[in-house]
Amino acid sequence: MKLFIQTLGCAMNERDSAHMIAELRDKKHYTLTNDIKQADLILINTCSVREKPEKKLFSEIGAFAKEKKAGAKIGVCGCTASHLGEEIIKKAPSVDFVLGARNVSKITQVLERPKAVEVDIDYDDSTYVFASSQGMGIKAHLNISIGCDKKCSYCIVPFTRGKEISVPKDLLISEAKKCVASGAKELLLLGQNVNNYGVRFSHSHPKTNFTQLLRALSEIDGLYRIRFTSPHPLHMDDEFLEEFASNPVIAKGIHIPLQSGSSQILKMMRRGYDKQWYLNRIAKLKSLVPNVGIGTDIIVGFPTESEQDFEDTMEVLSLVEFDTLYSFVYSPRPHTSAFEYDKSMLVSPEVAKERLARLQNLHKEILSKKAQLEIGRIHNVLIENHYNGEGQCWSEGRSSSNKLIKILDKKCEIGSIVKVEITHNEGGGLMGRFINELSLSEALASKEYFQNPIYIQEGALC
């Protein structure tokens, strides 16, 4: 039997899809297909963080229903499934079952139940996260927690994924070792609020925090890098920052969601910090790791956002000079406190879109400047892809600080670690020259993120 799966949204959804694929392969003997007309089972793993993907869902269901072969089943999974539940089947009778984000481990059970709806956000089966860690190549994903307790005023995730529960450390270490034994060089730790790890465990467990987990995982033989997403700024204490800086296995690229640079808007968002607190944490981080790569999320057009509020956000963008930016216009979501705001508090779509364009244009200018400053710098690159044919030869991978670097005229083995000098950039993309290949021990000892010239201005963020 054949499975077609469409995954929308975040890395957590990608991981959930990988789990369902493995469950269906191992227990029901399904194989993947990219041709929907051949599929016996069609899964749509959905996202509900913004309204647009939810609206698009029903048109996609209709299209799939027309294309599918007779007898093929359609299942809707993920956060939109948690949010809308039975409403999905009422609006789209061609859907055979609905499976919430917290319930993906039940995928093989619901197949035989007509019009099954499983959307229990309190369901606790944290062991499911291990079902498909192996065989993922040089980069493996590992869920260390599920759910979120934060209740930010704009975010529907606590409603769709439930309360926060951490996976016991010994289980994580055991699974991480299996990933490395299967060829993984890099682990991506996943959690809705990943650095709040340890707040609540699925069963009795000694007290452990995120920093202690990172330290334990980094001791696994053969592991080159650990990345994680997404942390919350509030849990970036000094113990964590010092471990992040000093531990060579922890990649020196980090995503730190800002959401807004306005202290007033941050208060309305229930983020728990203000503009200056955020900047102080960034200043501390950059003092420890000068060339750290920092990504962020920003929402523009949040209710009551004034021009000055927006300018505060632009100022933070200019000061921090984020390496990656995920930016969106505010999308009101049911089951959030911001959804109840009076319509008079909303920013007009025209103003919000104009602000988003200004924000993104400023970020493009920042990236262009930073790309020029990279020329001549040395990075250790974990090779993720290569190509040799039709008169072209190149390899591609990421540095510790998460910079995507293309190496021209050299085919490097996927999974190898190579030293690269940045020679130029094309359209903001970094191009480099192969210097030499490194052993794992050589790469961990070189600390390329300290060897490069520092381009931040001391005290600029204080």
UniProtKB/Swiss-Prot annotation:
Residue ranges annotated for the Radical SAM core domain, each copy included: 134-370
EC numbers for this chain: 2.8.4.3
GO cellular component, one term: cytosol
Entry binding sites for [4Fe-4S] cluster 1: 10, 47, 79
Protein residues bound to [4Fe-4S] cluster 2: 148, 152, 155
Keywords: 4Fe-4S, Cytoplasm, Iron, Iron-sulfur, Metal-binding, S-adenosyl-L-methionine, Transferase, tRNA processing
Top class in the EC scheme: transferase
Cofactor annotation: [4Fe-4S] cluster
Keyword Metal-binding tagged: yes
Localisation: Cytoplasm
Domain spans labelled TRAM: 372-436
Domain MTTase N-terminal stretches: 1-116
Cofactor note: Binds 2 [4Fe-4S] clusters. One cluster is coordinated with 3 cysteines and an exchangeable S-adenosyl-L-methionine.
GO molecular function, one term: metal ion binding
Catalytic activity of the protein: N(6)-dimethylallyladenosine(37) in tRNA + (sulfur carrier)-SH + AH2 + 2 S-adenosyl-L-methionine = 2-methylsulfanyl-N(6)-dimethylallyladenosine(37) in tRNA + (sulfur carrier)-H + 5'-deoxyadenosine + L-methionine + A + S-adenosyl-L-homocysteine + 2 H(+)
Gene3D superfamilies in alphabetical order: Methylthiotransferase, N-terminal domain, tm_1862 like domain
Annotated family: Belongs to the methylthiotransferase family. MiaB subfamily.
NCBIfam families: miaB-methiolase, MiaB/RimO family radical SAM methylthiotransferase
Oligomer and partners: Monomer.
Protein role: Catalyzes the methylthiolation of N6-(dimethylallyl)adenosine (i(6)A), leading to the formation of 2-methylthio-N6-(dimethylallyl)adenosine (ms(2)i(6)A) at position 37 in tRNAs that read codons beginning with uridine.
Name of protein: tRNA-2-methylthio-N(6)-dimethylallyladenosine synthase
Origin organism lineage: Bacteria, Pseudomonadati, Campylobacterota, Epsilonproteobacteria, Campylobacterales
